[in-house]
Amino acid sequence: MAQFDLNDDSVVVIIGSGAGGGTLGNELAQKGIKVVCLEAGRRLGLGDITNGGEMFAKISWLDPREGSGDLDPNLPAWICKTVGGTTMHWAGAALRIQPHEFKALTNYGRLPGANLDDWPITYNDLDAYYDRAEDKMGVTGTHGIPRLPGNNNYKVLAAGAKNLGYKDYHTGNMAINSRERDGRPACRQIGFCMSGCAIGAKWSTLYTEVPKAEATGNYELRPESMVIRINHDARGKVTGVVYADANGAMHEQKARIVAVAGNSIESPRLLLNSASNLFSDGLANSSGQVGRNYMSHLTGAVYAVMPGEVNLHRGTQMAGIIK
């Protein structure tokens, strides 16, 4: 792994090592661009990952927060503080947003209390990028990659779907290896995918993008490095960041470009905390919308008591899909 000087202002600093930051860092490093990735959390190895609830204490962002608004700043937010970010705890379900979902306002109209709007882009605009992402991540059911075999949850789902006359049901599109690929093993259906994946079959930047970037010699990962502030010069051009290391010591890393990829809470917090005389409302906030309009990802769940033993904890979190 490369090591860059704190005063090297030719590097690109990326804040965060998850789906956005980890992937960006690898793409830049592969093209010969020098990258310093600052990650607030620590780096885990496969030996640190266990199949159990205790993993959430290892990977979750548990730091207490202070806020000035009416809402509780410590509201439950399933984000991670670890190398790999939320690619460590996601279930691996890699589904495309469907064409009709890009036109929510057109399709559903104005709804009381809702702020529905149409996307400024369409499904066709993203199609080629979806294709590239699915290939990079090894998404099952795409690029000739076989789907995962059905676990017991899926067998129950499929039997019910068949009895009801459905024809289109399968184990979904998952960024979890159904066969050896990209130097990682096939899924063994051991469950607890959202605890990090103990064998590395699930796509996570911890297992994929970060080590590939390090292998180029153009990438330095600094875990347990909490960015406090983004600095800029008198013209307003970003010049670097100030961060605290694992011991609380403060450092300034110079940079030619800073990419902020610290999830939906930490990114706006950092931008707002980087306010200055030149940018009194925080960085990148000419709209006044940074830190506003927070939207959570909703998930519906259904549980049922079955006549036979199912062992729902085994296998992937998403049993399957019925269309």
Residues covered by each model-derived region:
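Short, solvent-exposed loop/turn and secondary-structure capping segments
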Residues: 46-50, 91-93, 101-102, 180-182, ...
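Redox-cofactor-proximal catalytic regions of oxidoreductases
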Residues: 56-146, 307, 311-314
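Residue-level detector of alpha-helix initiation sites
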Residues: 18-19, 23, 265
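A short, glycine/Asx- and small/polar-enriched loop/turn
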Residues: 182-184, 232-239
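Glycine-rich loop(s) and the adjacent beta-strand/alpha-helix scaffold that form part
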Residues: 27-30, 34-36, 41-51, 216, ...
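Conserved redox-cofactor binding core of oxidoreductases
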Residues: 69-72, 107-227
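Accessory recognition modules or surfaces
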Residues: 4-9, 45-56
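Beta1/beta-strand and adjacent pyrophosphate-binding region of the FAD-binding site
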Residues: 4-20
